[in-house]
Amino acid sequence: MTPGQVIIVDNPYGDVHARFGGYEHAVETHAVLQEPPHVAHIQLSPALTADGHYTIAPRLPAGGIQQPSQRIDLSVLVPEGHDLRVRTGAGFIDVHGVRGNVDIKSEGGNIELRGVKGAIQAETTGGAIEASLGRAPHGARQRLATTTGDIDLGIDDDLDAAVDMATSALFATDFSLDVTQHPGEEPNKRARTTVGRNASSLAIESRRGQIRLRRRAGFTSVGGASSDATAKQDGDEDNDSD
């Protein structure tokens, strides 16, 4: 791979798990395939696309139809400095510790984000979103959106972002909100707050799901010394390949 090359994972047949993969410009992919006998085989052949992106896109042969018990789940180790784009059908997407911008979308699966060192765009139709965010990149315009699912978001006091939220369900938060009602619209409530400095923006949207915006507290040791750095490392530097 070349430095800065975008990694695209497009898996309509199952889940995608992405983790930080080190500092060398190389992608490592693991696949778990489940197939009944005598069905069209899901093929996996990573390749460079015409626009220079590195693409991991399993596909059935032309005319093949996915069977109910047939799926392929992917685990991808993403090197530092490479942006990641993920697409699934109803598959679950979780991204932990990736050090680049992340753009993910599922047609109906749940999304989990933790320790991402870049700007985030995440969208699902009917699934829920659970995320833990640290300081946003300066000037970033981040967005978490679902049509009907809940959004549960933990953030630091130094997020440094103007936060806009919208839903027709409930807001539950540790932060003070400026809430406005919009009767007859969907979503019918909007809320705004600023966490830290107003140096970026974060939009959180669900038409009908609850939005929970929680403060991530720093850890205090038994001796009374604050260990915020340790807590951040535990929450943000998630480099395992689970």
Residue ranges and their predicted role:
Residues M1-D242:
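Intrinsically disordered, low-complexity terminal regions
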